């Protein structure tokens, strides 16, 4: 169910496949306590659903880290929140946690505002100097010193990534037009007789099992691969940008700064020159991290660097291949908001069901043997349409079967027995028999 190649050497597997092997080892061990760190990364949707169902039946205790909101909603019965060095346990579902956390932050904000107001008033009092000393209110001075210490120790909420797209010229009305496309790799058919039209402003998701050819389809649609049959035409005035799930466009030996811009201290954002350090701070990189080699970064930091570099460019057609891998929840939600507001066209490959549901207008689904179909809406909409289609097909099949059977003559119904009254029976016995 994890789509693992049984005979492959572990050392020859990709990072994603190695994660799957380790996940499989953890599951078959049947431990009392199972610890999972981002288990849905690099899994396809089918595998994630299977994992959810498996873990729902798991008899032991489960402690997991995840940014996958659908996964959290399905499994979590308690949320442990690490915020500014403090662990807080929130009983209940993920949805209840979100509500309670928001309420706590609002209370904290009100408390901090009152605290800061009091501190400001006390600072005014102490600056009065001679007047303050004359009062000889040493207790008030000590209280002020404690207020200063408390303010110094306060840890503010971490800043949020600032995502802004560059202004770009509108593309032509038709972005992609594909007619009867076929592409085969060795003995495997990726797409067969695939016809598809994408219009300006549409946001289209792509889902399917791992290895089905989602990335290959993107390369076909972008003109990086030529179809073996059929034709693909790209629209006019397209400025395309590609977010690569493998992060192959990053130079691991170079620093964060040099991966963003070389031989320059500034980037241009919507016509405004901005210093590299200031720009990277918008993506939560400290000055220390900015000069570190990319190979020392975490997966989430590399993703943020790719986003930082992506948004230095202008584009009206954005292609994103698994952008949510390793992203923290805040950045993921900000990216989601940006894509919803994006005025251009979007092609999105993702295993994150919530992310797809919240961003796309229709979805291309790999359904086996090179068949790729388009459905209105996101993942949940596809499930609903698929269920309706299956029910309709079953209804049609049952009608066909009933019509194919010869009609049988109805069995004669026995006549109902008439019960006579005692007087009638007596009269009947008096009738002479001839």
Language-model segments: residues:
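Short histidine/acidic/glycine/proline-rich micro-motifs that form metal-
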Residues: 130-132, 265-266
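Transmembrane helical bundles of ABC transporters
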Residues: 5, 136-139
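Alpha-helical coupling/stalk and coiled-coil linker elements that connect catalytic or binding modules
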Residues: 122-131, 145-146, 161-168, 175-177
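Alpha-helical coiled-coil heptad-repeat register
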Residues: 109, 116, 120-123, 127, ...
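ABC transporter TMD-NBD coupling linker
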Residues: 140-161, 203
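An intracellular "coupling" helix at the cytosolic face of ABC transporter transmembrane type-1 domains
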Residues: 97, 107, 118, 136, ...
């Amino acid at each position: 169910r994890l789509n693992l190649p049984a005979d492959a050497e572990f050392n020859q597997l990709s990072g994603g496949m190695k994660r799957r092997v380790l996940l499989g080892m953890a599951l078959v061990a049947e431990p009392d306590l199972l610890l999972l760190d981002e288990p849905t990364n690099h899994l396809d949707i089918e595998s994630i659903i299977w994992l959810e169902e498996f873990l729902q039946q798991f008899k032991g205790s489960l402690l997991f880290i995840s940014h996958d909101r659908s996964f959290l909603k399905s499994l979590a019965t308690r949320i442990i929140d690490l915020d500014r060095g403090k662990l807080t346990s929130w009983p209940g579902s993920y949805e209840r946690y979100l509500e309670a956390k928001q309420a706590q932050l609002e209370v904290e904000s009100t408390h901090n505002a009152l605290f800061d107001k009091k501190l400001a008033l006390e600072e005014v009092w102490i600056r009065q100097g001679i007047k303050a000393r004359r009062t000889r209110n040493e207790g008030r001075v000590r209280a002020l010193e404690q207020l200063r210490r408390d303010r110094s120790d306060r840890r503010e909420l971490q800043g949020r990534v600032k995502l802004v797209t560059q202004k770009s010229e509108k593309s032509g009305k038709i972005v992609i037009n594909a007619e009867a496309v076929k592409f085969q790799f060795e003995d495997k058919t990726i797409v067969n007789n695939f016809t598809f039209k994408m219009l300006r402003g549409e946001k289209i998701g792509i889902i399917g099992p791992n290895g089905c050819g989602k990335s290959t389809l993107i390369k076909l649609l972008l003109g990086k691969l030529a179809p073996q049959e059929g034709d693909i035409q790209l629209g006019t005035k397209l400025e395309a940008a590609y977010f690569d799930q493998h992060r192959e466009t990053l130079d691991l030996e170079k620093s964060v700064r040099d991966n963003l811009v070389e031989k320059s201290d500034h980037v241009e954002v919507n016509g405004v020159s901005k210093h590299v350090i200031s720009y990277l701070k918008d993506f939560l990189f400290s000055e220390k991290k900015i000069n570190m080699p990319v190979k020392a970064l975490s997966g989430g930091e590399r993703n943020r660097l790719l986003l930082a570099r992506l948004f230095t460019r202008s584009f009206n057609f954005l292609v994103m291949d698994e952008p949510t891998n390793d992203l923290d929840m805040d950045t993921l939600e900000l990216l989601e908001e940006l894509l919803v507001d994006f005025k251009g066209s979007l092609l999105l490959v993702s295993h994150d069901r919530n992310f797809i549901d919240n961003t796309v207008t229709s979805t291309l689904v790999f359904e086996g043997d090179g068949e790729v179909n388009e459905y209105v809406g996101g993942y949940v909409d596809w499930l609903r349409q698929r269920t309706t289609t299956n029910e309709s097909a079953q209804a049609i099949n049952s009608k066909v079967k009933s019509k194919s059977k010869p009609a049988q003559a109805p069995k004669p119904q026995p006549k109902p027995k008439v019960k006579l009254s005692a007087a009638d029976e007596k009269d009947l016995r008096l009738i002479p028999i001839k």
